[in-house]
Amino acid sequence: MNTNDIRTVKGEKSLQGTIKVPGDKSISHRSLIIGSIAEGETNIEGFLYSEDPLSTADCLRKLGVHIPEIKKDQPFTIRGLGIDGFREPKEILNCGNSGTTMRLLMGLLAGQTDRNFILTGDKSLNERPMGRVSKPLSLMGGKIYGRENGTKAPISITGNKLKGCVIGTPVASAQVKSAILLAGLNASGTTSVIEPASSRDHTERMLKAFGADIKIRGELGRNIVIKSGNNLTGQNILIPGDISSAAFWMIAASIVPESEILVKNVGLNPTRTGILHVMDEMGCDYKIIEKSTIAGEPIGSIKVKYVSNLKPFKVQGDILPKLIDEIPILTVAACFCNGVSEIKDAKELRVKETDRLKVMARQLKKFGANITEKEDGLIITGESKFHSAEVDSETDHRVSMSLAIASLLAKGSTRIARAGASNVSYPTFWDDLEKLIN
């Protein structure tokens, strides 16, 4: 990760124009992973060419999957090995900074019998919690070992026969749910996942499209049941733009005076659109146009205009999983609302790439923001007058981009250290910012 570069952003600039954000990160990971266990070819278009999905591709190649060199903005085809076709790798599988890669592979590899695998990551990933995946997989018969009683990477997996069972997840996490469902493909009988709240459902949608026997039951899709025995068949996948990347421009257009931005072809999966509900609460001026559905995923273009006198908002409870990655940029937005905004029930942010609650509070205070950090969230008093500052992404991609948007509201020029962290999810972010600055 190239995080050492410093970027300078001049404040008091408006943003105008049309932008197409990179492909959805969640769907990019899953297209590779599910394509790799399908039979036949899977054609992928719109793939996010960034560090995290490329880590997934690299790991799958070491497991024997045919994945060509992936080039930016070019479609490609992978040849799957079937549900139980991975070979034992000769090397350690390095997941880089990608929690999705590590957690989903843990589920996928747990049932690959009589083969051994070791997963590791960078310094940040090796401190992130893996027990939430290793514990349910162990209940299914998985043999998973690691630091701190299997809760921290490096992780060692000895493939074993798994048995289907009913598992309640302690947090509403798409990564945990996906790991269990992928393990369920190789388990005897039926595997059922019960969530405390609805989380991203890209895995369920894609598994169904590939031919898995999967059913969603219960209120808000909280009970997902998968039955082993069905072979998966390769598909054609067109990946929409990532709403978590689009959120930076949607919020920027809302809070930067005289701004208007059209973001094209954004994924509008209802488990990801919490940001739109908060924008409604704030009184933002946006509309969704050019709506369609591709491979079971709704998409549309979002047009957003600046509004003065935005209202404060409260984020808590079941909406958190629908906007967990948007909390950093929403923290910036709250600084420019008229009143006190509150983010609660967001403890999960403390175990992301960084402790995002602490880092966002620390960095935005350098601009002059009025933020109080709580154990599970933030209280932000709006109507801030930002001044230029020396800030630092602290190696977190979403922090880097949030600070860039905050800098547009500051008087003078702001320097952002380790700005290149944005490459993890949005490699063209700084180029796109230059295009939009008016």
Swiss-Prot record:
It comes from Prochlorococcus marinus (strain MIT 9515). It comes from the Bacteria. Monomer. The active site is at residue 325. Gene3D superfamilies: Enolpyruvate transferase domain. The keyword Lipid metabolism does not apply. It catalyses: 3-phosphoshikimate + phosphoenolpyruvate = 5-O-(1-carboxyvinyl)-3-phosphoshikimate + phosphate. The keyword Kinase does not apply. It is an enzyme of class 2 (transferase). Pfam families: EPSP_synthase. The gene is aroA. Phosphoenolpyruvate binds at residues 25, 99, 128, 175, 356, 398. It is found in: Cytoplasm. Belongs to the EPSP synthase family. HAMAP family: EPSP_synth (MF_00210). This is 3-phosphoshikimate 1-carboxyvinyltransferase.
